[in-house]
Curated annotation (Swiss-Prot):
Protein function: Converts the aldose L-fucose into the corresponding ketose L-fuculose.
Family: Belongs to the L-fucose isomerase family.
One Pfam family it belongs to: Fucose_iso_C
Gene Ontology cellular component terms for the protein in this record: cytoplasm
Protein name: L-fucose isomerase
InterPro entries with a match to the protein in the record: Fuc/Ara_isomerase_C, Fuc_iso_dom3_sf, Fuc_isomerase_C, Fucose_iso_dom1_sf, Fucose_iso_N1, Fucose_isomerase, Fucose_isomerase_dom2_sf, Fucose_isomerase_N/cen_sf
Cofactor needs: Mn(2+)
Length: 591
C-alpha cells in the first residue's frame, strides 16, 4: 500500500501586478522573501517523525486571481497543508489571499518604507476577517532596508511558531485515534467523543474491543522473530525492582517470564494495530498488516483486562518512549486507561516538539506545611511554594527520567532524532521494573519506576470537554523538582513507591489559577495531565487557536501569545477574545 505523504508548507509570494515598471522592480525581492522563508523552515524544522519539513514555493509571484489559482493547483498536487504568504509591497488584497478555509495560513508583510508591505498585510487581513477565514499576521518590529534579505528575530519566532502549530494541524488531519477498549473506571476522558475528533481535529475514531488484542496474542498475529529480539533486549536492559505484594500473590520465575512475554507482545500488537506491519502480510494476514492509520491510541486496561491479564504499563511505557529493542525511534502516543483527551494533549505535545510525553495522574498537592509536618524537612528552591506530585502506575515515557543531555549538559528530553543510543541506555538504566500491585492489577504486569531529574522546564497540559462549550485546553508551565532523597522516599511511599514520579512546581503569577500551587491543582480539570519538555505553552496556544479550542487556564507571558489577527476584533481582554472567537468561527472542521 502506498505510504501517505507528509504535509508540506506552501510559500505564496504576492506582488503588485502593475506592469511597465512596478511589478518588474519587485519580482526578485518578492521571490527572495519566499526563498528565505522556505530556507529558514527547512533548516530549523522537522516533522514529528524526524523528517525534514519540505516547502513548496509558487512557480510565479501572485498578482491576482489567475496566478492565485495556478498556485493553488500546484499546492493541491503536492499535499500542502499550511501556507505562508509573503510580500514586500502593496498587492491586491482579496484577489491574492489563500481562501482554503481549513488550511492554517499566515501573512508576512515586510516592514520597509520603499513599498507598503504593511498596507497589503492590513488589507489582506481585513479581507480574511470579513470572509471568516482567520489568518496570522507577521510584521517585523523594526524597519528594514529594501535590500535587506535577513529575517529579523521577532519575525523568525512567529514564522516558526506558526509553522510548528500549522504542521501539527495538517499532520493530524485524516488520521485516527485508536480506542482499544471502552470506558475505564468511569473516567470521562475514556468516553471517547467522536464529534470532538471529527470536528476539531479532522480525525476519525477507530473503536476496537480488547478481545482483538487477545486474538492477536493468542493466534500469533505478530512477527515471532521480533518477540525473541524483544525478550533478549529486555533480558539485557531491564532492572527489576521491589515486589511489594503479599507472599501469596508473588509469582514464581516462570510466571514472571510469562508476564514479561505477554507485556512485550501487547506493545508489539498495539503498535501493529496503530501503524500496521508489512511482515504480517508475508504470513497471509493482509488485513491485519494494514493497521488503523492511528496517530494516537488509548488502552482501557482497567479493569476488564487487568483483572485477568497483565496490565498495560510496560507496553504503554515502551510505546510512549523514544526507544525499544529496535533502537531509537519516534515515540508513539498511547494513553493509559484510554483517556483520549489526555491522549490528545500528548499528541499536541509530540507534534509540536517531536519528543516523548509524560502521562501522569495529577495526584497530590503537597503544601510546604504538609511536607514539613510529614518529613520534618522544609521545601526550598523551586519547590518552596509547594509541589504537585505527578505519578501513575507506569505508562510514562522512560525519557521522563531526563537522562538525556542538552548542548549545555543539562538534563532534558530530546526530539528522538537527536537522541544517542547511550542516552537511551541511560534512561533504561535509571528505570526499575516492579511487579504490579495485586490489589490494583490481579493479572499482574510490571510498572516502570523512575524519578525525573530536577530543574527541568516542563509544560503541563490537558484537554477537557465542557457540555455546551466544547473542548478547552489547560496549560501550566513550570519545572521538575528533585527533593532530598529522604524527603522524596517518605512522600513517595505514601502513594506507591513502585511507580514513576515527577514532582512539578508550576510558575506562579499571583493571579487567578496561578495565585499559588494549590490553585493550580484546584483548577485542574481532570485527574490526568501531560508533561511536555520545555516552556512551550505559547506553541500550544497558537495550535489551539488554529483548531478553535479556547484556552481556559495558562501562565504564558502575554507577549508570547500568538493568535489569528481577527481575535483582536472580539473584545479587549485577550482571553475573552479567545473564547468569543472560537465560538464565532466554530470548530475548524465544522460538522
Amino acid at each position: 500500500m502506498k505510504k501517505i505523504s507528509l504535509p508540506k508548507i506552501g510559500i505564496r509570494p504576492v506582488i503588485d501586478g502593475r506592469r511597465m515598471g512596478v511589478r518588474e522592480s519587485l519580482e526578485e525581492q518578492t521571490m527572495n522573501m519566499a526563498k528565505a522563508t522556505a530556507a529558514l523552515i527547512t533548516e530549523k524544522m522537522h516533522h514529528a517523525c524526524g523528517a525534514q519539513v519540505e516547502c513548496v514555493i509558487a512557480d510565479t509571484c501572485i498578482a491576482g486571481m489567475a496566478e492565485s489559482a495556478a498556485c493553488e493547483e500546484k499546492f493541491s498536487s503536492q499535499n500542502v497543508g499550511v501556507t505562508i504568504t509573503v510580500t514586500p509591497c502593496w498587492c491586491y488584497g482579496s484577489e491574492t489571499i489563500d481562501m482554503d478555509p481549513m488550511r492554517p495560513k499566515a501573512i508576512w508583510g515586510f516592514n520597509g518604507t520603499e513599498r507598503p508591505g504593511a498596507v497589503y498585510l492590513a488589507a489582506a487581513l481585513a479581507a480574511h476577517s470579513q470572509k471568516g477565514i482567520p489568518a496570522f499576521s507577521i510584521y517585523g518590529h523594526d524597519v528594514q532596508d529594501a535590500d535587506d534579505t535577513s529575517i529579523p528575530a521577532d519575525v523568525e519566532e512567529k514564522l516558526l511558531r506558526f509553522a510548528r502549530a500549522g504542521l501539527a494541524v495538517a499532520s493530524m488531519k485524516g488520521k485516527s485515534y485508536l480506542s482499544v477498549g471502552g470506558v475505564s473506571m468511569g473516567i470521562a476522558g475514556s468516553i471517547v467523543d467522536h464529534n470532538f475528533f471529527e470536528s476539531w481535529l479532522g480525525m476519525k475514531v477507530q473503536a476496537v474491543d480488547m478481545t482483538e488484542l487477545r486474538r492477536r496474542i493468542d493466534q500469533k498475529i505478530y512477527y515471532e522473530a521480533e518477540l525473541e529480539m524483544a525478550l533478549a533486549w529486555a533480558d539485557k536492559n531491564f532492572r527489576y525492582g521491589e515486589d511489594q505484594n503479599a507472599s501469596q500473590y508473588k509469582r514464581n520465575e516462570a510466571q514472571n517470564r510469562a508476564v514479561l512475554k505477554e507485556s512485550l507482545l501487547m506493545a508489539m500488537c498495539i503498535r501493529d494495530m496503530m501503524q500496521g506491519n508489512k511482515t504480517l502480510a508475508d504470513k497471509g494476514l493482509v488485513e491485519e498488516s494494514l493497521g488503523y492509520n492511528a496517530i494516537a491510541a488509548g488502552f482501557q486496561g482497567q479493569r476488564h483486562w487487568t483483572d485477568q491479564y497483565p496490565n498495560g504499563d510496560t507496553a504503554e511505557a515502551l510505546l510512549n518512549s523514544s526507544f525499544d529493542w529496535n533502537g531509537v525511534r519516534e515515540p508513539f502516543v498511547v494513553a493509559t486507561e484510554n483517556d483520549s483527551l489526555n491522549g490528545v494533549a500528548m499528541l499536541f505535545g509530540h507534534q509540536l516538539t517531536g519528543t516523548a510525553q509524560i502521562f501522569a495522574d495529577v495526584r497530590t498537592y503537597w503544601s510546604p506545611e504538609a511536607v514539613e509536618r510529614v518529613t520534618g524537612q522544609a521545601l526550598s528552591g523551586l519547590a518552596e511554594h509547594g509541589i504537585i506530585h505527578l505519578i501513575n502506575s507506569g505508562s510514562a515515557a522512560l525519557d521522563g527520567a531526563c537522562k538525556q543531555r542538552d548542548s549545555e549538559g543539562k538534563p532534558t528530553m530530546k526530539p528522538h532524532w537527536e537522541i544517542s543510543q547511550q542516552e537511551a541506555d541511560a534512561c533504561l538504566a535509571a528505570t526499575e521494573w516492579c511487579p504490579a500491585i495485586h490489589e490494583y492489577f490481579r493479572g499482574g504486569g510490571y510498572s516502570s519506576r523512575f524519578l525525573t531529574e530536577g530543574g527541568v522546564p516542563f509544560t503541563m497540559t490537558r484537554v477537557n470537554i465542557i457540555k455546551g462549550l466544547g473542548p478547552v485546553l489547560q496549560i501550566a508551565e513550570g519545572w521538575s523538582v528533585e527533593l532530598p532523597k529522604a524527603m522524596h522516599d517518605q512522600l513517595d511511599a505514601r502513594t506507591n513507591s513502585t511507580w514513576p514520579t515527577t514532582c512539578f512546581a508550576p510558575r506562579l503569577t499571583g493571579k487567578g489559577p496561578f495565585t499559588d500551587v494549590y490553585s493550580v491543582m484546584a483548577n485542574w480539570g481532570a485527574n490526568h495531565g501531560v508533561l511536555t519538555i520545555g516552556h512551550v505553552g505559547a506553541d500550544f496556544i497558537t495550535l489551539a487557536a488554529m483548531l478553535r479550542i479556547p484556552v481556559c487556564m495558562h501562565n504564558v507571558e502575554e507577549a508570547k501569545i500568538y493568535r489569528p489577527s481577527a481575535w483582536a476584533a472580539h473584545g479587549m481582554d485577550i482571553e475573552g477574545q479567545d473564547y468569543r472567537a472560537c465560538q464565532n468561527y466554530g470548530p475548524l472542521y465544522k460538522r
